[in-house]
A protein has these predicted regions:
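A residue-level marker of the well-folded mature domains of exported/periplasmic proteins
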Residues: 2-8, 26-365
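Sec-dependent signal peptide hydrophobic core
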Residues: 9-18
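C-terminal motif of bacterial Sec signal peptides marking the signal peptidase cleavage site
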Residues: 20-25
Length: 365
């Protein structure tokens, strides 16, 4: 079983760390400023909007701040494990001094890690832990807690509506994604002790919204329109698919509270419109810079710096130096104090024509 550090660092603490590291540059090391190392950032897919709009630019910005002469070799695998392997090989051939790997799946990631190990190139597992692999660092969120936040919010919402023993549909993430297993584990730890019945449950290949829509259609066929009271969707993409299926079946999404994750713009707007109940906000503005700072150190042959490292995570092979951040549950009531306050999305981005009145009602301006 994978161990999570006991005290994940909160958002404010990591923010202070990153600011301090930028101000200090590369510290007192004789290689301060960097010598033009190449750092590979290998992201898994682009169906989840955050990777291209948040992770990539924030990572590149922090690399430039910490190591002006360093360059980033960027690749996105579009959910194709073979493609990610080829991209990793290409990065190594180009002379990458560290791989920052957000793995498509564990099996292909293990091959990449072994290849990097053979060339003495360190690997930082980004966002998704790579089980049983000889990785050098890990940066992510407390992923079991993500599932617990989702399940707790959904359970409380259903029970506050007068449903003592609700039935739900679970639309989980990709079976090849280690994080998806952790989200599910966290969620089930709540559902199994709360009197919630799981009417239908699915694992969603590739985190595909289209496949999630098909799964939800199957659940509606099996359970009936009135046979479930809520939907656990592991992220905002799968939530969108589930909501589309309910709408097509003549079910008002507002009557079936649906969870999500990633605070995607479309999801935030759905929450304001009452179509989606909640999402989980993960401050990528802290995660990506922390990974960049650690990657610069690894590229120079240095140990992962503490901070931003705040503990270790056992991946089944070793205790991996880790930065674990704290996720935040977001409903309509705290969009303004979390997502907007942090600048993840601006009010002008969220409050387009159709959502202007809902924004005003929620105090977003």
């Amino acid at each position: 079983m994978f161990e999570i550090p006991r005290r994940p660092v909160g958002l404010a603490a990591i923010a202070l760390v990153v600011v301090g590291l930028v101000a200090a540059g590369c510290g007192s090391s004789s290689s301060s400023g960097g010598g033009g190392q190449k750092i590979a950032l290998l992201l898994p897919e682009n169906k989840t909007a955050r990777y291209e709009t948040q992770d990539k630019p924030l990572f590149e910005k922090q690399i430039k701040a910490d190591c002006p002469k360093c360059s980033v070799i960027y690749s996105n695998a579009n959910q194709d494990p073979a493609k990610q392997q080829a991209q990793a090989e290409a990065a190594l051939t180009q002379g990458a001094k560290v791989l920052v790997l957000d793995a498509v799946d564990a099996a292909s990631a293990d091959v990449i890690v072994k290849r990097a190990n053979a060339q003495k190139v360190p690997v930082l597992a980004y966002d998704r832990l790579i089980p049983n692999a000889n990785i050098d660092a890990y940066v992510s969120f407390d992923n079991e807690r993500v599932g617990k936040l989702q399940a707790t919010a959904l359970t409380q919402k259903l029970k506050s509506s007068g449903t003592a023993a609700p039935t739900i549909t679970m639309i989980n993430g990709a079976p090849t994604d280690n994080n998806a297993a952790l989200f599910k584990k966290g969620a089930l730890s709540v559902f199994n002790t709360s009197g919630v019945k799981i009417g239908k449950q699915f694992d969603t290949p590739d985190w595909s919204p289209d496949k999630a829509q098909t799964e939800m259609q199957q659940a509606i066929t099996a359970l009936g329109n009135n046979g479930f009271q809520g939907v656990y969707a592991a992220n905002d993409g799968t939530a969108g698919g589930a909501i589309a299926a309910m709408t097509s079946a003549g079910i008002q999404p507002s009557t079936r509270p649906t969870t999500g994750q990633d605070a995607e713009l479309a999801a935030v707007q759905r929450i304001l419109a009452g179509q989606q109940f909640m999402t989980v906000y993960k401050a990528v503005k802290l995660e990506a810079p922390a990974a960049a700072t650690i990657a610069v150190a690894l590229s120079k042959g240095q140990k992962p710096p503490t901070p931003p490292i705040n503990g270790t995570t056992n991946n089944g092979k070793k205790n991996v130096p880790s930065t674990i951040l704290t996720p935040v549950a977001v409903t309509k009531s705290n969009i303004n104090s979390t997502i907007v306050k942090d600048g993840f999305w601006t009010a002008s981005q969220i409050c387009t024509g159709a959502y202007a009145s809902a924004c005003k009602a929620a105090g977003i301006a």
